Each structure stands twice: as structure tokens, then as C-alpha cells.
UniProtKB/Swiss-Prot annotation:
Protein name per the record: Large subunit GTPase 1 homolog
Protein function: Functions as a GTPase. May act by mediating the release of NMD3 from the 60S ribosomal subunit after export into the cytoplasm during the 60S ribosomal subunit maturation.
Record-annotated CP-type G domain positions: 164-444
An MF annotation (GO) of this entry: GTPase activity
Basic residues compositional bias, start-end: 16-28, 636-658
Provenance organism: Homo sapiens (Human)
Coiled-coil parts of chain: none
Domain of life: Eukaryota
Domain notes: In contrast to other GTP-binding proteins, this family is characterized by a circular permutation of the GTPase motifs described by a G4-G1-G3 pattern.
Gene Ontology CC terms, in alphabetical order: Cajal body; cytosol; endoplasmic reticulum; membrane; nuclear body; nucleoplasm
Similarity-based family: Belongs to the TRAFAC class YlqF/YawG GTPase family. LSG1 subfamily.
Binding site for GTP: 212-215, 393-400, 437-440
UniProt-listed Enzyme Commission number(s): 3.6.5.-
Length: 658
């Protein structure tokens, strides 16, 4: 049985309550001479939409403050401001980039790392920790003022004091401090103030820049960087951690692997160098010395690869140097303002026994690297009878891979996350040679935009909010023909009213890539954010190779790999034309005449089956006579309906989608 309905008089109470509520609401906002107890002179705590506000957005906070202050705002119709297409890409114009570069040069002396305060045997641990905290706090305030006053963008830097303490201890214990940088952009990962701080602690300590992933550079590019750092009076070594474990075999192997890397391989192959070019470069840059043999000694034994973790209690056993022996911080910052010639002369006066620096441009092997470490430091060592080499670098430049390659097996876990290594470690390669591994530190440096930080691998790609600026930077650095040859896509060409040599936009690249890979959204459009993550990861890994040139060089002519790929493409096109082959059809161009004069046939589209067993939709009721006559003409059930099969509309009108 159904539910028993309530009698009609049961809703009288609700009707009276509803009437009383409506009556009170109607008289609440009307003036009346009658006496009433509802004065409406207080806050209405009984309303239903009462909410507690503990956090507001910037706009809501501004409007709420203006309402409390009794300020009213009136909309004004001002002049219209047109936003150009370049502003939507998130990239800077040429004038803006030049202005930011000038600001970077003017404020370079303020970009420093925190110093360890002076201490001696009478300093208590509590006093030392408090002094370190005070210096670290003042250093962070200085960087914040630099960002706010000069409107500059700094890379994310390490904000944990414990990691900087590990750096201080590594510098104190090391005879040679090695900065590991990425070969594609060495100046971004180089910290000049760290080199100054090493000389402040002890003039006998040596600075070396180890350019990792140097197999991504050509011989001409390595020579250009070697000459640049030689003018800067900085010792550099070209090295590849992944290729260092493989013996160098010959010229043909280098060319084959370099071509494979430029033709869509993401792994680094065997790296080698031209013997004739090496001998020529060594005759120009290197003094006459015996070249170390390339035979590698086994280092997998437990005695040769002894591992030791240095606890903090052993700090008193090491010889430490205070900042009183070296120049002050102001003097060091003043030296960086001067030219490189004056800087080298000041260093030569400070250390007259120092040799003239000569850099060579070939890739060194593992044994050559160890021999260079032994020959580089000839002064007084921190620990008698032992050469200590401290390795410092960003977490994603290959520091851990370098250590594992030198040791011959996996001694340090490889990770791209800052803070993976909590404490410095000492790794004995052989008797008398010790590697001191410092935790990965992200040091402050200048960048122009966040897109540059994402493309350099500093910011994680999976956590980016806006994919348009980084992909626009990739399109600006990588030519159109390289993108098309790498991914096998056809990017839409510019319109007739545009520059035919302009770089493709991010939307054009991501749309073509998404269509080719099948990355589509629920609405049938190419998934641009997903395509952007794949392209940016290929750019960071080196599949899309772009090498930043030294200052003063043209970035376009410095990309020899792009020029070689273009020449190969032109040669292949000429061969195809000679053989009489048809060239691959290009994507439909945005031609104004074709679009304007193209006439489409207007037709009606139906949904469903066109004909079933001889019946056509809209032909009316099928009688027995008509059915028999049609069946007599043939056997339609054996024709399968393939002759007049209905095509999908998206296939018929595919040319209208783009």
C-alpha cells in the first residue's frame, strides 16, 4: 500500500508560520508609526549565510579594506591598450633583455654566498652557531633587498643553513675545489663568488671548473669556451661523466654518436675527439709535458675504493683557515668590478708562484682527469701526504655521476632533487688522493625569466603552471627545420602577411606535436600542456640541443649542429629531386586567396544508417510489392553495403579543422 497522506488540516501550522515570516520581512524595511521590538540596530546573527573569513585573496582583501575605510571606486574609461602577440608568449623583447643584462653586470658583486664567521679554539659551539645564524640571516635579507629594489629574478637557492655548513667544511678540507657545471650553459651554473671565497680562506687552494656533458659540444664550441675561460684566468676541464666510463676509440665513433644524438636519441653515446685537432690545440694551449696514459687501473677493489664518512667531531683534527689571512669581502667584490686583466694581475701578485693558465679543449678520460688533479696543486696541502679534491655543483649537472665514474662503481646515489645528500663524504680513489663529496647546493644566480629556469632544469617541469613561455623559448632557440626533423612533424607555415623566417609559436608546435602523437583532450583538441612536458624534457635532456655561446659570440652561428642538420636536409632534398621522387606534401598553408575563393558545397548530413535491406530513410512505408521488386534485382544482403558506405564527417571535412 502507498504511504498514508496527512489530513488537509495538518499543514495549517506551517501556513501560519510561513505567513508570519513573510509579514515580518515585509514590515522590516518599511517605516511605520507602530511600536516594534525589531529595531535593526545591531548585527543580525541569525542569518543563514554567516561565514567566518580567515583568508582572503589580494583582490578581496583590497576591496574589504576599501569598504572599511569608506572609499568608493568609480570605473573610468581610459584609452585602449593593445597587447602585442610577443607579450602573450612570456618572452622579453630585445631592449628589455639588454636592460636586464646591464642590471646583472652592475649588481654582480652583490650576488655572493654566505661566509662562515671567524672562530678559534676559544669559541664555544653555541657562540659559533649563533654567529652563523646571524650572518646567514643578513645574507638572506641582502638578497631579498636586491630582488625588491632592482626588480631582478634570482634562481631558487638553498635556504637551509645546514647545507651551507657542509660547504664551508668541504672548502676548509679541500686542496682543490672543483665546480661542476653544465656544458650547455656554463655561466649559469658557475658561481664566481665561490672562487673568491676559496682564495679568501687560503691562497694555496686551487679553483677548477669541470664542464660536464661536454660531449654535447663540438670541437669548435669547446675551443671557444676554452679560450674564453683562459682570458678570464680560470682553469677548465672538459669532461663527460657518462662517456668517461667508456674508452675513447676514434673519430668515426664520435661522428656517429653525435649524429645519433641529433637524430632523436636521448642517451649519450660514446664520445671521442679528433686526434689531429687535439694535437693542434695542445700545441697552442698546453705546455710541453708527457701526456698521461689512457690505460685505466682497476679501482673496484675494496682497498682502492675505501669509503669513509667524516663526522663533525673530527673537525678539530683538520687545519682550518680564517678569513683574516685573505682579503676582505669588500676587497673581493671590488676585484670583480674590475676587468679580468687587472684581476689576474692582482692574483699573480698575491701568489707569484702560480703558473700561467692554459686550457685545452678535448675531452679527458678518467685517468687523465686524475692526473690533472695531481699536477694542478703543487703548494702546501691541508693534510700532509694527501691531496683532497672537493666537488661542488648543482644537483642536476652530473656531480654524482662524475663521482661514480671516477670510483668505477656506484658509491653515491644519483638524484636530481636538492638535499638528497645530507652530509659530506670522503671517497678514497687511491692512496694519497681523496674526493670530498659536498651535498648538492643551488647557489643564487641571475636569470631573465622563469621560462629560462624551467628550460635549464632548475625548476621541475611537472610542476610548472604556464607552459607557453618555456615552449616559446624552445621555439626561439631551436630552428623550425630541427623541430620538424626531430619529431617528424610538419609545422604550419607563416601567413603571407608575416615574416616567412619567423620562429613557430608555441601553439603551432604543440598542436602539430599533439596531432602526431595522438595527445587529444576530451573535446577533440590537441593536449598542449601534455605535449609541452614531453618537449621540455627533451630540451633538458639534450635531445633538442641548444648551446649557449660565450659572451661576444653570435648565438645563431655558434649552433654548428643546427647548420649541419640543415645542410644534410638540403643534400637529401637535392638527391630526391635528382631521382625524380615527389617531395613530401606539406601541410595546407594559410594562403588568403585559397581561403577566400574556396567554395564549399552546402549539404545536409544525416545520422544513422542510410539504407537497411533496401529501405532508404524518408522514402515512406515499404510495401510488399516494392520490396519484392527490389529483391528481384539482386541480393543486397551479399553486397555488404560497401558501395555507398557512409563516410565519417570528420574525415570528409578534415581540411576545415585547421
Amino acid at each position: 500500500m502507498g504511504r498514508r497522506r496527512a489530513p488537509a488540516g495538518g499543514s495549517l501550522g506551517r501556513a501560519l508560520m510561513r505567513h508570519q515570516t513573510q509579514r515580518s520581512r515585509s514590515h522590516r524595511h518599511t517605516d511605520s508609526w507602530l511600536h516594534t521590538s525589531e529595531l535593526n540596530d545591531g548585527y543580525d546573527w541569525g542569518r543563514l549565510n554567516l561565514q567566518s573569513v580567515t583568508e582572503q585573496s589580494s583582490l578581496d582583501d583590497f576591496l574589504a579594506t576599501a569598504e572599511l575605510a569608506g572609499t568608493e571606486f568609480v570605473a573610468e574609461k581610459l584609452n585602449i591598450k593593445f597587447v602585442p602577440a610577443e607579450a602573450r608568449t612570456g618572452l622579453l623583447s630585445f631592449e628589455e633583455s639588454q636592460r636586464i643584462k646591464k642590471l646583472h653586470e652592475e649588481n654582480k658583486q652583490f650576488l655572493c654566498i654566505p661566509r662562515r664567521p671567524n672562530w678559534n679554539q676559544n669559541t664555544t659551539p653555541e657562540e659559533l652557531k649563533q654567529a652563523e645564524k646571524d650572518n646567514f640571516l643578513e645574507w638572506r635579507r641582502q638578497l631579498v633587498r636586491l630582488e625588491e629594489e632592482q626588480k631582478l629574478i634570482l634562481t631558487p637557492f638553498e635556504r637551509n643553513l645546514d647545507f651551507w655548513r657542509q660547504l664551508w667544511r668541504v672548502i676548509e678540507r679541500s686542496d682543490i675545489v672543483v665546480q661542476i657545471v653544465d656544458a650547455r650553459n656554463p655561466l649559469l651554473f658557475r658561481c664566481e663568488d665561490l672562487e673568491c671565497y676559496v682564495k679568501e680562506m687560503d691562497a694555496n687552494k686551487e679553483n677548477v671548473i669541470l664542464i660536464n656533458k661536454a660531449d654535447l659540444l663540438t670541437a669548435e664550441q669547446r675551443s671557444a669556451w676554452a679560450m674564453y675561460f683562459e682570458k678570464e684566468d680560470v682553469k677548465v676541464i672538459f669532461w663527460s661523466a657518462l662517456a668517461g666510463a667508456i674508452p675513447l676509440n676514434g673519430d668515426s665513433e664520435e661522428e656517429a654518436n653525435r649524429d645519433d644524438r641529433q637524430s632523436n636519441t636521448t642517451k649519450f653515446g660514446h664520445s671521442s675527439f679528433d686526434q689531429a685537432e687535439i694535437s693542434h690545440s695542445e700545441s697552442e694551449h698546453l705546455p710541453a709535458r708527457d701526456s698521461p696514459s689512457l690505460s685505466e687501473n682497476p679501482t673496484t677493489d675494496e682497498d682502492d675504493s675505501e669509503y669513509e664518512d667524516c663526522p663533525e667531531e673530527e673537525e678539530d683534527d683538520w687545519q682550518t683557515c680564517s678569513e683574516e689571512d685573505g682579503p676582505k669581502e669588500e676587497d673581493c667584490s671590488q676585484d670583480w668590478k674590475e676587468s679580468s686583466t687587472a684581476d689576474s694581475e692582482a692574483r699573480s701578485r698575491k701568489t707569484p708562484q702560480k703558473r700561467q693558465i692554459h686550457n685545452f679543449s678535448h675531452l679527458v678520460s678518467k685517468q687523465e682527469l686524475l692526473e690533472l688533479f695531481k699536477e694542478l696543486h703543487t703548494g702546501r696541502k691541508v693534510k700532509d701526504g694527501q691531496l683532497t679534491v672537493g666537488l661542488v655543483g648543482y644537483p642536476n649537472v652530473g656531480k654524482s655521476s662524475t663521482i661514480n665514474t671516477i670510483m668505477g662503481n656506484k658509491k653515491v646515489s644519483v638524484s636530481a632533487t636538492p638535499g638528497h645528500t645530507k652530509h659530506f663524504q670522503t671517497l678514497y680513489v687511491e692512496p694519497g688522493l681523496c674526493l670530498c663529496d659536498c651535498p648538492g647546493l643551488v647557489m643564487p644566480s641571475f636569470v631573465s625569466t622563469k621560462a629560462e629556469m624551467t628550460c635549464s632544469g632548475i625548476l621541475p617541469i611537472d610542476q610548472m603552471r604556464d607552459h607557453v613561455p618555456p615552449v616559446s623559448l624552445v621555439c626561439q632557440n631551436i630552428p623550425r627545420h630541427v623541430l620538424e626533423a626531430t619529431y617528424g612533424i610538419n609545422i604550419i607555415t607563416p601567413r603571407e602577411d608575416e615574416d616567412p623566417h619567423r620562429p613557430p609559436t608555441s601553439e603551432e608546435l604543440l598542436t602539430a606535436y599533439g596531432y602526431m602523437r595522438g595527445f587529444m583532450t576530451a573535446h577533440g583538441q590537441p593536449d598542449q600542456p601534455r605535449s609541452a612536458r614531453y618537449i621540455l624534457k627533451d630540451y633538458v635532456s639534450g635531445k633538442l640541443l641548444y648551446c649557449h655561446p660565450p659572451p661576444g659570440r653570435d648565438p645563431v652561428t655558434f649552433q654548428h649542429q643546427h647548420q649541419r642538420l640543415l645542410e644534410n636536409k638540403m643534400n637529401s632534398d637535392e638527391i630526391k629531386m635528382q631521382l625524380g621522387r615527389n617531395k613530401k606534401a606539406k601541410q595546407i598553408e594559410n594562403i588568403v586567396d585559397k581561403t577566400f575563393f574556396h567554395q564549399e558545397n552546402v549539404r545536409a548530413l544525416t545520422k544513422g544508417v542510410q539504407a537497411v535491406m533496401g529501405y532508404k530513410p524518408g522514402s515512406g512505408v515499404v510495401t510488399a510489392s516494392t520490396a519484392s521488386s527490389e529483391n528481384g534485382a539482386g541480393k543486397p544482403w551479399k553486397k555488404h553495403g560497401n558501395r555507398n558506405k557512409k563516410e565519417k564527417s570528420r574525415r570528409l571535412y578534415k581540411h576545415l579543422d585547421m
